[in-house]
Amino acid sequence: MSEQEVKELDLNGEMLVRREKLAALRAKGNAFPNKFRRDALAQDLHNQYDSEDGEILKEKSIEVQVAGRIMTRRAMGKATFITIQDMSSKIQLYVARDNLPEGVYKDDVGTWDLGDIVGVKGTLFKTKTDELTVKTTEVQLLTKALRPLPDKFHGLTDQEVRYRQRYLDLISNEESRRTFIIRSKVVAGIREYFISKGFMEVETPMLQVIPGGASARPFVTHHNALDVDMYLRIAPELYLKRLVVGGFERVFELNRNFRNEGVSVRHNPEFTMLEYYQAYADYHDLMDNTEELLRKLAIDILGTTIVKYGEYEFDFGKPFERITLHDATVKYGADKGIVKEDLYDFDRAKATAERLGIEVQKSWGLGSIVNAIFEEVAEHHLIQPTFLMAHPAEISPLARRNDENPDVTDRFELFIGGREIGNGFSELNDAEDQNERFDAQVAAKEAGDDEAMFKDEDFVVALEHGLPPTAGEGLGIDRLAMLYANAPSIRDVILFPAMRQK
């Protein structure tokens, strides 16, 4: 018999015993009661009483009602020490036969298993080892767990199981719970920041007839009643800018985007984005906003402007570096013989790209080639927080052209740890220029670029009504959560990530 078969046999045997216990509970009446009400969380009790002297705590005779999942139990004759875990932390229970009604210790507490959810009433005291504990006087089994905790609660280490059965991961791993608490604080902090700045939170369509706002491959679905193909949105940008045209001059949205692309440690097909738009601002204002926001999040979540990620350490209290895409490519490509002149001539850029092993697509112009060279030689060097600016107009179809050099745009991308975190720009509000750029995207799509943008005629009409000078930015919530939680994979910060079917 294999080791796996032995484990399955043991599991089946343990589950059979637990089901028999549940059957006995059903025979007594309601096996899943719902009238117990706790009045305290474990962490709140620790915060308030861990530093309290044991004798003083005993004299105060503080009565509490707590509830949670049994994580450990240690029987000592007529008493049992039990550790329960609630949403905040863990706390120890002292359950003694003499402190409970007759028969309860043997008939009820004696049948409890690891993983069961219980509610108790009792008074706080300190053990000889100075551990805050609840001396129980009333107990109630609230939920009988039919399956045991993972590996007798030695921890859930199988990554595949952690992602597929996140509930087990959250029960077993304190670090995972901390990660998702941080993620929640990131979202709450962003919302608080923008509301405090006078922005209005809005919701725009997730199902779109024309997917726009980004260069990506969309998911396609079909609306039966309307008999029309629709797309899960790849970005909310064009709808948000319509709102600015309509007079909502400061808007933001925190919501899902969907892109039918690969899955990796940095990519999930369903992900969360912040997008915001501010009238009478430019991309410099947005870079300032971003620095301020990330600094605020670090202080609120971590208590410091120092953010540690893997082997790196970032100080969000310092100004972020700002460098153009062309300058970064020359700076980090110098050891590969790249000079400035290679990036301003099509033939030289194409030859440079091919020398680097880049497969140049027929539909690419100079801007796309230069961007590919940047990604090859420079992107991974942008470790410290860096705003990469002045992207080629060819790869920035929605961004405003730069006044001094119309071949590039007033655009930036934020890189931290060699990864893109955000993307923003002064918005293109010239309807005729936008129409021409959409046409160029259509031509690229017809030439085989399946990530080129669709043309949105109605958006052009909206621009013809007049979009005030505006700047907008998108920030990846998942990647921000990875950063603040020091999580190596995007799957570690998404509760239920996309997984290949078994």
From Swiss-Prot:
The keyword Ligase applies. NCBIfam families: lysS_bact (TIGR00499), PRK00484.1 (NF001756). Binds 3 Mg(2+) ions per subunit. One of its GO terms (cellular component) is cytosol. Its EC number is 6.1.1.6. It comes from Haemophilus influenzae (strain 86-028NP). This is Lysine--tRNA ligase. The gene is lysS. It is an enzyme of class 6 (ligase). One of its GO terms (biological process) is lysyl-tRNA aminoacylation. Homodimer.
